A protein has these predicted regions:
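Short, glycine-biased loop/turn motifs at secondary-structure junctions and
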Residues: 1-167
């Protein structure tokens, strides 16, 4: 797993998924290279879906915005985006350009995101696997796994798993 310094206050880490061959909606081909700068060839600065690159800010959002999120062989990417470039679309964000910081599977990408994006700590990250101790809270997004100890609370989004102890 690649490492990077924590996301700055001027940038944010965004989670996204692609097909196993790194293609996304419309056949867009993502490069298979950490550090690659990616630009949307059809960028349009508006608040409509399409005409840009898309993902989940800090890993949180509507998993239904991706057709590949549930695929076992999906590639999970973490990309770095300038905050001033982000446009919120309700459940996802779009942006004109980004830098690829991680390419992997669900587990490695969500671990990378959480380790390098401090703002991900307070949100339900799609696909994350997290554990909490006794009397603690643990929350993850869709397709995630949350485990909390005795008298703890575990919450998972759609198609996720939550387990909490009871003694």
């Amino acid at each position: 797993m690649a490492s990077m310094k924590k996301a700055s206050q001027e940038t944010a880490l965004v989670l996204r998924t692609c097909s196993a061959d790194l293609t996304s909606h419309g056949g867009f081909q993502w490069p298979d290279k950490i550090g690659a700068v990616v630009e949307a060839p059809d960028w349009k600065k508006d608040n409509k879906c399409g005409h840009g690159l898309h993902g989940w800010l800090f890993g949180q959002g509507d998993h239904g915005c991706s057709s590949t999120v549930g695929e076992a062989d999906a590639k999970w990417l973490v990309v770095e985006v300038g905050l001033s470039d982000l446009i919120a679309l309700g459940g996802k964000v779009k942006f004109p350009r980004c830098t690829i910081r991680h390419i992997g599977d669900r587990a490695s990408a969500t671990q990378f995101l959480i380790a390098n994006e401090p703002r991900a700590a307070g949100v339900a990250v799609i696909g994350a696997t997290l554990q909490a101790g006794d009397k603690e809270l643990c929350q993850v997004g869709a397709y995630g796994t949350a485990t909390a100890g005795d008298e703890g609370t575990a919450t998972a989004g759609d198609k996720g798993t939550a387990t909490a102890g009871d003694e």
